[in-house]
């Protein structure tokens, strides 16, 4: 009988170890596993001696070792079986791919010529052989069948692959976000089945335009639904391909079209004011400063002053322009760059301005929800959305203070509201949500509003100003009548500590034929957040810019 040596301190359980006294195993179990009938000698303190050396294993230790060796043997057999299955699977896969290599995709020249279409027109082409191009949005392959949900930005369609098209190697190498050109006939779905638009495309030929990566670089690893928001913003260029974000961007496009439609119907002219300016509108602390050929200049906070200069030449005007605010704010309602819809109207009174704002919001929302593309998207994103109805509730600032105090809602210092306090967003939201209807909050104190706002004739402590408040979202727009008395405007500019000379072109509007006029500004992203039920305005900007975020 052969013998093997075991030393728990210096030994090693390895197939490279011989089990000799010079190369002992580490455990008796492994020693028996390698040499089933061998005599086991373990390194231990020898009987009746203080010395250590190799001696025969005890009966109890041998019993335990045999049990351990049996476990190792079963583990080896299991591993061998698994390796055999893996080898067989690899052989089968290699055989399958070899068979796939023999399958070639060729277009049947006898078929009718395919009509090139965009997916938005699929309903107009049922029964027609078409060619569509786009990105693989979803992909599912099963025995003898392949399902591709194709996206081209204008819509989706389910494409069915059968026969050799489903079996070929090219199909089994497809990945999400790969681009393809697909030809086939559009058919209505059989009863009981569902797919985008209620149709499917029976594919007879396709080509790969660009194969997206698989493995670690796969699209699904780049953009994960529950990933940290900052990581998703880093991958914004890919995240935009998701259904929710792209839907918001489509609603955004329709919203801007609806805005322009309303203004055209009201007879307003669109203008394009400059973004680089040397005057401020909303306070110097939020200006982005820049060196403009050696002079100090800023990115515009608002185009209002320039719009006012257009009234004598062009009549009522509006612009859709980027505005910039250097606010170090991390709230869900603020951006450093946003799309500002602004308008100025000449020869109006305060009540005319309020009525105009009601009409603007009501009609624009109506146009958007009735749009064949944006309407269903809003229903999908915000199923509980209810379009506002005229007239809106009108509430004066002082009456809002009374309401807040009566309902136990304190100011930012935890005290009762008093005249001159700014109503913080949280208190404003609570009031609006409780009342539950759109509110025109009017007549704010002079000291909490901008220098250019017209004072009320019946109470010079307050201005002809308005914030439009919507339930669940808060303020969506603000406006005012503008000071049109030159002396009063000059005094206001000086009171704010602004350089009067820089505003010469603005005060000239009062010198050379002044008139009562007013205007307002809407943040596109805030309107969208309301329409689409988005938690933050960041989801409503193509590439949002805010404190700490200026990429990609």
From Swiss-Prot:
Q: Where is the composition biased (Polar residues)?
A: 12-23
Chief location of this protein within or outside the cell: cytoplasm
Look up the record and report any one GO term of the cellular component aspect. cytoplasm
> Its GO biological process terms?
asparaginyl-tRNA aminoacylation
GO terms for MF:
asparagine-tRNA ligase activity; ATP binding; sequence-specific mRNA binding
Q: What is its EC number?
A: 6.1.1.22
Q: Which UniProt keywords apply?
A: Aminoacyl-tRNA synthetase, ATP-binding, Cytoplasm, Ligase, Nucleotide-binding, Protein biosynthesis
- Gene3D superfamilies in UniProt: asparaginyl-tRNA synthetase, N-terminal domain, Bira Bifunctional Protein, Domain 2, Nucleic acid-binding proteins
Pfam families assigned to the protein according to its UniProt record, in alphabetical order: AsnRS_N, tRNA-synt_2, tRNA_anti-codon
- Top-rank taxon of the source lineage equals Eukaryota
Catalytic activity field: tRNA(Asn) + L-asparagine + ATP = L-asparaginyl-tRNA(Asn) + AMP + diphosphate + H(+)
Output the InterPro entries linked to this UniProt entry: Aa-tRNA-synt_II, aa-tRNA-synth_II, aa-tRNA-synth_II/BPL/LPL, Asn-tRNA-ligase, AsnRS_N, Asp/Asn-tRNA-synth_IIb, NA-bd_OB-fold, NA-bd_OB_tRNA
What segment(s) does the record annotate as region Disordered? 1-23
What is its subcellular localisation?
Answer: Cytoplasm
**Family membership noted in the UniProt record:** Belongs to the class-II aminoacyl-tRNA synthetase family.
UniProt-recorded name of the protein: Asparagine--tRNA ligase, cytoplasmic
Q: What gene is this protein translated from? A: DED81
